[in-house]
């Protein structure tokens, strides 16, 4: 990797810390870990974001950091959190990159942090995992279901917080979305469970 790319990625990752400006411990943990990043390098692979996700990232209400994200040569792929065939089927409309974590561009055993988006008119069903988690919306809109509560729409700067083992689901309607997320606690995916779409 050339030096400019390495510097740009490190600066970008450090800038992500400013997004986690809430008072809850998970956001404080994200800020602490991001502030420690001393080196970051791009993967040798690259896959572009879908046009429908890029479009919402260029809207006037998108978080300013989206302008940097679209310039990064990331390898955007559906996540592989579960080996379940149903999970794989319900992941083809997702775009994801783990930036910091056990599988990230920056290695960490304290957090998993990445960028995650979905195409419009898509639904990612109910899942649970030991890690505590928060998503911060960067562009577009996403409807989040937490526990037994109904779906709630979140837009840029909105948050969806999921304590350990809380069932949660997400879906889009007319718009795609882009977000940044962080896991803390048990970062293993061994106990991740995906149960499919919520019952109507």
Residue ranges, per PLM feature:
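A short, N-terminal "cap"/entry segment at the start of jelly-roll beta-barrel domains
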Residues: 6-109
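Double-stranded beta-helix
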Residues: 10-16, 173-200
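Short beta-turn/strand-loop junction motif enriched in small, turn-promoting residues
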Residues: 102-104, 122-123, 166-168
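Short, conserved beta-strand element in jelly-roll/cupin
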Residues: 110, 115-121, 128-144, 183
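Residue-level marker of beta-strand positions
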Residues: 123, 134, 158-161
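Short coil/turn segments at secondary-structure boundaries
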Residues: 129, 148-149, 194
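Short acidic-glycine-tyrosine-enriched beta hairpin
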Residues: 147-168
């Amino acid at each position: 990797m050339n030096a400019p790319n390495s510097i740009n990625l490190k600066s970008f990752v450090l800038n992500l810390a400013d997004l986690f400006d809430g008072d809850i411990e998970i956001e404080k943990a994200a800020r602490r870990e991001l502030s420690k990043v001393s080196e970051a390098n791009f993967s040798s692979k690259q896959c572009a974001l879908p046009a429908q996700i890029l479009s919402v990232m260029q809207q006037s209400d998108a978080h300013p950091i989206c302008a940097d994200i679209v310039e990064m040569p990331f390898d955007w792929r559906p996540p592989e959190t579960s080996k379940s065939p149903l999970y794989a089927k319900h992941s083809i409309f997702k775009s994801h990159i783990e930036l910091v974590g056990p599988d990230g561009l920056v290695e960490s055993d304290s957090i998993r942090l990445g960028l995650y988006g979905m195409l419009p008119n898509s639904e990612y069903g109910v899942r649970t995992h030991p890690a505590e988690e928060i998503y911060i919306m960067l562009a577009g809109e996403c409807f989040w279901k937490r526990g037994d509560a109904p779906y709630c729409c979140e837009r840029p700067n909105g948050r969806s917080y999921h304590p350990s083992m809380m069932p949660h689901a997400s879906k889009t309607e007319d718009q795609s979305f882009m977000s940044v997320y962080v896991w803390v606690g048990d970062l293993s995916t061994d106990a991740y469970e995906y149960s499919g779409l919520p019952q109507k």
